[in-house]
From Swiss-Prot:
Gene assigned in the entry: infA
Gene Ontology MF: a single term: ribosome binding
Assembly and binders: Component of the 30S ribosomal translation pre-initiation complex which assembles on the 30S ribosome in the order IF-2 and IF-3, IF-1 and N-formylmethionyl-tRNA(fMet); mRNA recruitment can occur at any time during PIC assembly.
Protein name: Translation initiation factor IF-1
Domain S1-like stretches: 1-72
Family in the record: Belongs to the IF-1 family.
Reported function: One of the essential components for the initiation of protein synthesis. Stabilizes the binding of IF-2 and IF-3 on the 30S subunit to which N-formylmethionyl-tRNA(fMet) subsequently binds. Helps modulate mRNA selection, yielding the 30S pre-initiation complex (PIC). Upon addition of the 50S ribosomal subunit IF-1, IF-2 and IF-3 are released leaving the mature 70S translation initiation complex.
Keywords for the protein's UniProt record, in alphabetical order: Cytoplasm, Initiation factor, Protein biosynthesis, RNA-binding, rRNA-binding
Annotated SMART domains: S1
PROSITE patterns: S1_IF1_TYPE (PS50832)
A Pfam family the protein falls into: eIF-1a
GO cellular component, one term: cytosol
NCBIfam families assigned to the protein according to its UniProt record, in alphabetical order: infA
Source species, domain of life: Bacteria
Length: 72
């Protein structure tokens, strides 16, 4: 899968799950389970409930995603 296949959406963190997984509500109302990208984990970027985030989704599984950016 290449990077062009994925697309990004904005959302809000609704719930924190174990193993750095988060439940994110997207702008369109859908709720997805997302994990932190490797660079965010490496740089110790903390994500809390209520944070605005950018989630990268693939067309293969729209219920899972990767958090690539946390808005301030």
């Amino acid at each position: 899968m290449s990077k062009e296949d994925s697309f990004e959406m904005e959302g809000t963190v609704v719930d924190t799950l174990p193993n750095t997984m988060f439940r994110v509500e997207l702008e369109n109302g859908h709720v997805v389970t997302a994990h932190i990208s490797g660079k965010m984990r490496k740089n110790y970027i903390r994500i809390l409930t209520g944070d605005k985030v950018r989630v990268e989704l693939t067309p293969y599984d729209l219920s899972k995603g990767r958090i690539t950016y946390r808005a301030r």
